[in-house]
Amino acid sequence: MLKNTEILNMPVIHKITHLSELSKIIKSKSGYSMTIGVFDGIHLGHQFLINETIKIAKNQNHNSCLISFSNSPYHFLTKKNDSNNYLSTKYEKTNILSNYKIDDIFFIEFNDEIANTKAYNFLEYLNT
């Protein structure tokens, strides 16, 4: 059974389908320290990035944020739909990431809009 403090420390999970949604949420916060990646199978490198993001956020009095994808950018871009190539299911990934003391987790749907967005413009959405 979860304790009230455990419930309060769980991250807010956002499902994003358009970059404008992401930008709107980011604008509503006082500041974010972010890490971005697919995070399929949370290995030691991922753990380091997540923990460093949390540490930097605390030091800068920001919210900590992890941005991942609800679907595989690789599979989207190559048109391969092989669900057996994942190390963890979406459910497992969400559960694993929820154990970190990160404030917000964004799962962005990798779609044509994201695929056609230049890297600079993508960063503009994050730095609004």
Where on the chain are the PLM-derived regions?
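Nucleotidyltransferase catalytic core that binds NTPs
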Residues: 1-128
